[in-house]
Amino acid sequence: VSISRYFGARRFRLGAAALAGTSLMALAAAVQAGEVRGRVIDANTGALLEGAALQILENGRQSTSDRSGGFAVADLAAGQYTVIARYTGYQPVTQTVVVDQDGVVPIELRLGGELTGTELGDIVVTGARAAQARALQVKRTAPTIIEALSADDVGKLPDANAADAVQRLPGVSISIDQGEGRYVIVRGVDSNLNNVTVNGQIFPGPEGGSRRVALDTFPSDIISRVEIVKALTPDMDANAVGGSINLVTASAFDRPGGFGYGSATVGYNDKSGNTPYSANLSWGRLFGSADQFGVVLGLSHSFRDYESDTIEGGGYRPVNGQILPDSQVFRDYSIERQRTGVVANFEWKPNDEWRLFANNTFTRYADDEERDSLTVQYALGTLTNATPTSGQYSGGRGTIELRSRKVVQTLYNLSAGARYAAGPWTLDLNGVYADAAEDTPRRIDWEFRSATNAFPNTYSASGPFLDIRSPNLQDPARYPFRRVRRRTDDVQEDTYSLGFDLRYDLDQASNFLKAGARYVQRDKSWDRQNTNFTGTRTPFLLSAVSGRGPDDFFDDRFSFGPVVDFPAAEAVFRDNLANFIPDPATTVTDSLVTDFDVEEKVAAGYGMASAELRGVTVIAGVRVEHTDADYSAYDLQRLGGVLTGTPLRDGGTRYTNVLPSVHLRAEPMEDLVLRAAWSNTIGRPNYTDIVPRRDFNFDETSAGVFRGSISEGNPDLKPFESMNLDFSAEYYLTPAGIISLGLFYKDIENPIYNRTIDQTNTTIDGQFFSLLTTTRPENAASGTIRGIELNYQQQFTSLPSPFDGLGLSANGTLTGSSTELFGRTDDIPFFRQSDTLGNVALFYEKYGLSARLALAHRSGYLEALNAPGLDLYVADRNQLDFKASYRLREGIEVFGSILNINDEPLETYLGDESRVSSREIYSWSASAGVSFRF
């Protein structure tokens, strides 16, 4: 968001200078030479505690422990001081130190093993309680509005990947694929507009035309913590209209005594009867003469083979006086998914000032699926015997298809850097190389289609789906070969980043100056190769390669019919290649229509200051990002279906965004934290939207007069620009709970939607068109998103035994949005924005038993725009999950889980919930296993 949107640039510079001057005067203090430096440790586990609040009682000076549990308070006069450490879920600990006129006083604060508030017997800070306490402490001491989820909490539900895990957080939902979470939606903002980082460093996405990162590629086992920042500070990448999602992997310095943990799981899927499995192992250790070196190695692998069934309606139109789908599609999926994750982190701390690191993260996600489908176009020919809910047609067409596809996504991230901290100065240097690739070595589509009058039929529309009956619909001899398309895709994105951050601490931790810069370059390409065959020289019927379809399709409610036997069809193709007629025109166009090359460079710099003014911590600053990008893609030109040219088109964009922000944090009373923030963020357009691709189809209707259509990208697109207002009130409960309220508002300029324009009597490329229809993405005017977030978590340790092991976690989000969209007068929400989100989890932890029952709710959201009244929505979804574990002995647990207990499907509808567009069913899954720690 350009600052000139709110006030002139000159006025902003004057205001920023005044603010900086005021902050510096407020921070003026005499520099002393003494320093207290130490770390905070969990007495039970030896883990170093991040986010502990430290305070020197004599002068009120404060600090917060970093990830290694370390903290420092410098510039102290000689004398005796009392240091107190506070951490959610633990009793405060104090220690007295004597500081000389110069030098460093080391200190170690060990927080006790019992939760505060009661005598808890064998309830120690482990499992769900410790996970909740750590996440709440990160949230409590954060300088901005953040949600956190620790590794233990991730493992307390049957979450297969990072997306499944974070949907439990306030204001967060997910879009699912085949029953698993895939993309994260923060506060109703599309996943393309979120920033994803690993250990705070940028991470690319492997998919072809989008910027989103599919978090189902990350096994949840290799993650130490997930953080979602909802209000960004100037030192964070600004490409995050929704928020910034940070995946944190383990460090050997998290637990100086070393650690190791792993698990093995085997499961059962009710739909397929198959047995998925998974295993993971992580190990971390310090070594060297002074434990100055640290290494963490982690490996995770899972295999899941399962099935799903889908029924989908075609486009709705008037049929016999009703709005009905003009066709119905039956799809049966057989899927194998494998996930592999590897973490290799290396660190070196030669002394208290220096830390050097090299973090390596690798994930591999392989999806191998076969999809059988039957499409029935029933409303052909003459309609007779019509009633309000049924009728008979003299014609009908069937299409039987098989899609065999394998997609492999790999993500590699190498993040290396150093931190130097001495006295008030902290310098961070970092560099990133990231490689993201999506390889489709096989996508083969076989299609057999009947004549238009092959299947006279009767239909009934009394239920959510049509009941279509035709006596010969399942006769494979009625389906001649139509085409086979063979495709490979190679998507590659290489990302390079260099940056630094320099911080100068003034008289206490909340008072500092900070500045930094970062350069990011992305090189992305998409190369598709298609080979199409659209006929045979001699007749080829489905009956020659048919197989038996599923016997229990859609829980035996529908009959599927014959399918394409893939090995048999491939054998016929291989042995009779000369019989298949190639289609060179569509081979070329399908191969080039998605191809592009992108080079995008972003140079960013920021400055910020933090000051505590009358009990309120103020962080104010500005970030400037300059984007410089060049693109190339193909211009496909077709006259009467014949390809006439494929020139390469070039394009580019240049723009600068000035992004100020102010964050306020106050603790007006013990355990109450108030926050407010004004921030500005951007969302760069998707690659497929902004590259200069064009598909130009036209016909000559008379001499020198043409009619045609254009589908193209738009290099002139502006980025989304979002002005964000946030407020939150957080009250922290004893022993480890919270009641919180959050309000947010986003004013978003330049949202991007596809627009179709009909032009009459116009000239383009030197040719006269009586009608030219152009479809391309364009910036709409503006839109808003606003919402309320409620969160409650508590551990009921005050109840009598055995009920003192109970706990509850519940959150809800109410959201609304609207946008001004060309050609529409109705109220249009943002894509994937749900009006309501909610999570409820009841857990119990005592006597070595840990159990959690959790319900996740998401209301419907807009998926795609069609004609008014027929927009595509994803319907409400409520999923119930359960997991329990039992500690057999110290370090060894057995566990079991059930996912999707209520057998919740995924549904879509068109405009009105009565117009069901599709329903996909997965059934429930169960798993059991053993975990260990050493």
Residue ranges of each PLM-predicted region?
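Outer-membrane beta-barrel signature, preferentially recognizing the C-terminal barrel domain
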Residues: 394-413, 590, 594-603, 653, ...
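Gram-negative outer-membrane beta-barrel transporters
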Residues: 743-748, 757-759, 763-862, 902
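C-terminal beta-signal and adjacent terminal beta-strands/loops
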Residues: 857-864, 885-934
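Short, acidic Ser/Thr/Gly-rich low-complexity loop/linker segments typical of extracellular
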Residues: 59-72
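Outer-membrane beta-barrel translocator/receptor signature
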Residues: 207-212, 221-228, 235-318, 323-326, ...
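Short, acidic, small-residue-rich periplasmic hinge/interaction motif at the N-terminus
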Residues: 41, 45, 55, 86-88, ...
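Short loop/turn motifs that connect adjacent beta-strands in outer-membrane beta-barrel proteins
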Residues: 236, 252-258, 288-293, 353, ...
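Extracytoplasmic beta-strand/coil segments of soluble accessory domains associated
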Residues: 163-202, 230
